[in-house]
Design a protein with these regions (language model features):
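Conserved alpha/beta catalytic core and glycan-binding cleft of carbohydrate-active enzymes
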Residues: 43, 59, 64-230, 243-247
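Short acidic/histidine-rich active-site segments
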Residues: 229-234, 238
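Substrate-binding/active-site clefts of carbohydrate-active enzymes
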Residues: 1-44, 48-75, 94
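Conserved, mostly hydrophobic/aromatic
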Residues: 31, 38, 49, 84, ...
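Active-site-proximal loop/turn and secondary-structure-junction residues that shape catalytic pockets
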Residues: 53-55, 90, 234-235
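Catalytic cores of secreted or luminal carbohydrate-active enzymes
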Residues: 260-276
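The substrate-binding groove and active-site-proximal loops of carbohydrate-active enzymes
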Residues: 12-29, 52-64, 103-106, 194-208, ...
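A non-catalytic, amphipathic alpha-helix used as a structural packing/dimerization or gating element
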Residues: 30-33, 37, 207-214, 218, ...
């Protein structure tokens, strides 16, 4: 059931210590049976696979050109019509954005969109051409025969900063996680607009909201499927923590009172969605 090294240790392409041997016939059938059950019995109409590139590795850990599991998912009579979304990389360094084996069925989280647009929006030099590529559907990544929604465009997700925090913090602040602020990504491409974290300065607060509006405007006018993090539409904050997996408290909860405080942002996002 697991990928093993020649000396019997676990391969770790998942970041959690072991990796399921997805393309072994027995394991592949087990996965297909589980997904079919969710579709037939619970009417689930789509699946998003975390670290999906690990699904395309062989028994020795190497990437396969035609992974049997991914091909089976694409052509299965039950699963062949549900939405399939891949986080097209894994914890072992395999990065397949634009090249994930998809049989014209899978959509991909476009990590290049996130990184390039973050850098462009905060004014990094030399990013205009990359931003154009992302906005028009990333044709440098996805060939003309790809569906327009093959790219799932996003600037924020459950991993990393919220949109509010992207423009309120230059550095992550994960001290509450207990790892001396060593966990979580350092490649945030964020900008605090002049002050780190909380402020009552009206000029900085106005600038931060403008940056959030810029991000939503670009995202919702880009070719491809648009995705944003719940709470971003009303300025939810995680207080600079960009890795809240272990926080079941005010750090990770949605503060619905922000909906009233940031009604202007919420109205703008609603209108942008209607415009799209």
């Amino acid at each position: 059931y697991y990928m093993l090294t020649p000396d019997g240790c676990y391969y770790n392409f998942s970041g959690v210590g072991n990796t399921l041997n997805c393309n072994h016939p027995v394991v592949r059938q087990f996965i297909l049976d589980c997904l079919r059950y969710w579709v037939v019995e619970y009417r689930v109409d789509g699946f998003r696979f975390d670290l999906a590139s690990s699904l395309g590795r062989g028994e020795d850990g190497g990437p396969l050109s035609r992974p049997p599991l991914l091909e089976s998912l694409a052509y299965d009579p039950i699963l062949g019509h549900v939405k399939l979304i891949a986080e097209a990389w894994d914890a072992g360094g395999l990065y397949q954005v634009g090249s994930f084996p998809d049989w014209n069925r899978w959509a991909e989280w476009n990590g290049r969109y996130r990184d390039d647009l973050r850098r462009f929006l905060k004014g990094d030099g030399g990013m205009a051409q990359a931003a154009v590529q992302r906005i028009i559907g990333s044709p440098d990544l996805y060939q003309p025969d790809k569906r327009p929604n093959a790219s799932v465009n996003f600037i924020t997700c459950h991993d990393g900063f919220t949109l509010h925090d992207l423009y309120a913090y230059n550095q992550k602040h994960n001290e509450a996680n207990g790892w001396n602020n060593t966990d979580g990504s350092d490649a945030n491409y964020s900008w605090n607009c002049g002050t780190e974290g909380f402020t009552e300065d009206p000029d900085i607060l106005t600038l931060r909201e403008k940056m959030c509006r810029n991000a939503f405007a670009v995202l919702l006018c880009s070719r491809g499927a648009a995705m944003f993090l719940a709470g971003d539409e009303f300025g939810n904050s995680q207080y600079g923590n960009n890795n809240t997996y272990c926080q079941d408290n005010e750090i990770s909860w949605l503060d619905w009172s922000d909906l009233e405080r940031n009604a202007g942002l919420f109205d703008f996002v609603s209108r942008m969605i209607a415009f799209r």
